[in-house]
Curated annotation (Swiss-Prot):
Residues 3-225 form the Glutamine amidotransferase type-1 domain. This is Phosphoribosylformylglycinamidine synthase subunit PurQ. Part of the phosphoribosylformylglycinamidine synthase complex involved in the purines biosynthetic pathway. Catalyzes the ATP-dependent conversion of formylglycinamide ribonucleotide (FGAR) and glutamine to yield formylglycinamidine ribonucleotide (FGAM) and glutamate. The FGAM synthase complex is composed of three subunits. PurQ produces an ammonia molecule by converting glutamine to glutamate. PurL transfers the ammonia molecule to FGAR to form FGAM in an ATP-dependent manner. Keywords: ATP-binding, Cytoplasm, Glutamine amidotransferase, Hydrolase, Ligase, Nucleotide-binding, Purine biosynthesis. Coiled coil: none annotated. It catalyses: N(2)-formyl-N(1)-(5-phospho-beta-D-ribosyl)glycinamide + L-glutamine + ATP + H2O = 2-formamido-N(1)-(5-O-phospho-beta-D-ribosyl)acetamidine + L-glutamate + ADP + phosphate + H(+); L-glutamine + H2O = L-glutamate + NH4(+).
Length: 228
């Protein structure tokens, strides 16, 4: 399986994602520039964290206009897996691939710590290697991770089981403690915590490895989940 790791000006977690796929999961990955226009030959797309375009205007607001994003939208609409982490989540909401928005943290400052999450739905391409209701520890590092959407959208997220992860405590003001959501089809996931920083026990936790193992399990089995 081959993963595309996107790189925007200001991305700073792309190497961590590459390491998680190549060195830990022993799969193939390649960096793909924001100037590229094709994702041919890739099985999954990973959009890393960082500060794309220095978060100018709004986190992800300029990145959504990069040439590669046209290909990402087409890739997602074709039902292929797309994972956006931290700034990647922000980019996905700006691009309209996920509902809602990421607002400044309620505390109005950057938060960098390890938090506890609960797996709300394990019937997705990204969570099938976790038990439903399991708690996992993942790092966060963001200033704008406060998930918000209108009441109708929030009701739809719950009704469609699109909430993949929640924080077990109120970390940043996110509605219903939402930490990660999928699109309605289930092939796009955005999450603020960093699973790629928790794939080796040596570094404190391997709880994030399940996200990548879940993607691989689905790709290799050819079985899709969550409404596909």
């Amino acid at each position: 399986m081959k993963f595309a790791v996107l790189v925007f000006p200001g991305s700073n977690c792309d190497a961590d994602l590459y390491h998680a796929i190549v060195d830990v999961c022993h799969e193939e990955a390649a960096y793909v520039s924001y100037t590229a226009t094709s994702l041919a030959g890739f099985d999954a797309v990973l959009i890393p964290g960082g500060f794309s375009y220095d978060d100018y205007l709004r986190s992800g607001a300029i990145a959504k206009l990069a040439p590669i994003m046209t290909a990402v939208v087409a890739f997602a609409k074709a039902g292929k897996p797309v994972l956006g982490i931290c700034n990647g989540f922000q980019i996905l909401t700006e691009a309209g691939l996920l509902p809602g928005a990421l607002l400044p943290n309620r505390q109005t400052h950057f938060i960098c710590e390890t938090v506890t999450l609960q797996v709300e739905n394990n019937d997705t391409r990204f969570t099938n290697q976790y038990a439903k209701g399991a708690t996992i520890a993942l790092p966060i590092a963001h200033g704008e991770g406060n998930y918000y959407c209108d009441p109708e959208t929030l009701a739809q997220l719950h009704a469609n089981h699109q909430i993949a992860f929640t924080y077990t405590t109120d970390v940043n003001g996110s509605l219903d403690n939402i930490a990660g959501i999928t699109n309605e089809a289930g092939n796009v996931l955005g999450m603020m915590p960093h699973p790629e920083r928790a794939v080796e026990v040596l570094l404190g936790s391997a709880d994030g490895l399940g996200v990548f193992q879940s993607i691989l399990t689905t790709l290799k089995s050819g079985v899709v989940t969550h409404g596909e």
